[in-house]
Structures are given as C-alpha cells and as structure tokens.
C-alpha cells in the first residue's frame, strides 16, 4: 500500500519561514574541494585486478554570503508576517557559534518531520545546499526519522524531480561518509546524540584516527562539508556537553524543531497547541490548573510564581497568610 501525501498550507508556511530567511542568497550547486585522502598504505605487489581508484573530489555547501544585517532584515520580515516578536539580534549558541540559529515551533502531531524534510528539499532547490545532518535524542526517534525519509521519497521525487538520500551514521560503515562528501545530490546523515557525545570506546570512534578509514577522523571528513544541522527535539539534547559536541560539525546553520523549546534562539515560526487546535490540526488540548473555591480577600493564599521544566518539574510558590 502506497501512502499519499497532500501538501498542507500550514506545513508550507513552516518551510517558507526558514527558506525566506535567506532571501537574496545566490544559488550555488556546491563548492568543489579535495576530500582528505588520509594515509594510503603502499602497495608492495600489484594486484591481479586493481580496485577502482577512489575519487577525492568533494562537494560542500556554499557559504552564506548575506551579511548579518541582511539576515536580520529577512528574519524581521518573516517574524512580522507571522506576528512573532522581532529579534533584537541574530542568536548564536555553543552548538553553532557565529552561524544562524533558527527555531521552528510546531505542536506535536502536526508533521514536524515532514516539514524539515521538505525544508531540506526547498533549501536545495533555491540555494543549492545539499549536505545535511539530522541530530536526534534517541535511537527510537532516529529509526522513526529514517522511516519518514523512506516513505516520503517518492512524494518528494514527484515534487522536486529528485529525492534526498538518507543514511544512519554507523562508525563501522564509514564508506557512507565518502559518498556523503562526494555525491552531488541531496545527502542527509541521521545521527543520535549518543554517537558523538558519549564516552564509550565505540561511540568515540567519530573522533579517532581509524586504520580502516585511512588514518582519518570521521568528524574531520564530516565538518569539511559545512553541513546544515537540524536538531529534532532540542530540549532533550540541551546539556552543555552535547552542545559543545555539536560545534564539532562546523554547521553552516542550525535549525531546531520542537513543540517545547527549552531555550529560545531566533524564532521564525510558531504553531503552538492553540493554533493547532483552532486550525483543527489536533482534536483537543488539555490545560492543567488549580481550582480554588471559597477564597475571600481576607484569607490566606498560595501564589504559583513559576514552573521549572526539568527531568522532575517543580513549581516556585509564594505563601501569604494575610
């Protein structure tokens, strides 16, 4: 059974929010560079059948040529069209210092994964950017994202005349990185945060010089592509250690997609729970609160000042005994 996907305007609006931020950026179908060949072992005797020589030609994302002032002007235009507060400046972060850090807020169940896949295709169509990394907080989400790429491939082929090639990063299948670097098409690497911020030997291979990778470090091959990094559910990846690890990717820009951003950056789109309900995108929303009965002005009260969202949520209160 084939799934049929319908273009939804509210999803297109979320795509356009990111794409229009870079209005004026010229289209460039990748910048050629030489992939680090690593250390090649000398051949002591000619083989009967020579293997095909590996190409060292790579294609990386072109740099953003817009100035900070131009980007901020574009951001303001996007924010005005969506009734969002205007950003005083472009936000930076430890995960992508000096690069655009954009937040897209979308309520759960409104097709967030579809939106960022379509954003990838639209950024490639308009500006030529073709190298992407999607960072997810768990293996389960990683597998779900890969499945989304697989089931939408034909849909995007029909829309754009091409489809993204996606793969899950695996430190034992590093030939995928060679193809990621050299292929001219849309390349998407999906990686869970544990693959590069954990301390185990297998997880740390991304930072090691590997004999089976011509004594190169996988992270160096990745960062040479100047990838666009997309974080799915960033509030689950917010530890300082993880943010510093993300900086190793040398991101051209960082796009965050979530219904509940814990830290705000440059917000370019918002589809919150109430918006989703009003547009009939979700069936219902629930609001949890306190009900107070029989409270007179002369009686004591308890005032809830704030709620801290952490692993164990807690509230800050104020008691007045009058």
Name each model-derived stretch:
Residues 1-322:
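RecA-like P-loop NTPase motor core of helicase/translocase proteins
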């Amino acid at each position: 059974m084939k799934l049929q996907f319908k273009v939804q305007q509210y999803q297109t609006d979320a795509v356009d929010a990111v794409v229009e931020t870079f209005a004026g950026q010229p289209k460039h179908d990748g910048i050629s560079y030489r992939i680090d060949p690593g250390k090649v072992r000398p051949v002591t005797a000619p083989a009967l059948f020579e293997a095909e020589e590996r190409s060292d030609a790579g294609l990386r994302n072109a740099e953003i040529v817009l100035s900070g002032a131009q980007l901020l002007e574009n951001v303001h235009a996007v924010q005005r069209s969506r009734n969002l507060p205007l950003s005083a400046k472009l936000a930076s972060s430890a995960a992508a210092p000096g690069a655009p850090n954009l937040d897209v807020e979308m309520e759960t169940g409104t097709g967030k994964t579809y939106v960022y896949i379509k954003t990838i295709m639209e950024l490639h169509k308009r500006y030529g950017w073709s190298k992407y990394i999607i960072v997810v907080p768990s293996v389960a989400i990683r597998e779900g994202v890969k499945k989304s790429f697989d089931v939408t491939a034909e849909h995007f082929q029909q829309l754009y005349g091409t489809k993204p090639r996606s793969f899950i990063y695996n430190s034992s299948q590093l030939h995928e990185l060679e193809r990621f670097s050299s292929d001219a098409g849309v390349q998407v690497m999906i990686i869970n945060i544990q693959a590069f911020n954990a301390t185990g030997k297998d997880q740390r291979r991304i930072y090691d010089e590997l004999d089976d990778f011509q004594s190169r470090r996988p992270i160096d091959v990745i960062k040479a592509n100047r990838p666009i990094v997309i974080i799915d559910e960033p509030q689950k990846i917010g530890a300082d250690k993880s943010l510093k690890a993300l900086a190793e990717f040398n991101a051209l820009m960082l796009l965050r997609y979530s219904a509940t951003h814990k830290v705000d950056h440059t917000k370019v789109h918002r589809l919150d729970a109430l918006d989703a309900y009003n547009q009939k995108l979700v069936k219902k929303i629930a609001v949890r609160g306190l009900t107070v009965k029989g409270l007179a002005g002369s009686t004591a009260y308890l005032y809830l000042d704030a709620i801290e969202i952490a692993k164990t949520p807690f509230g800050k209160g104020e008691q007045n005994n009058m």
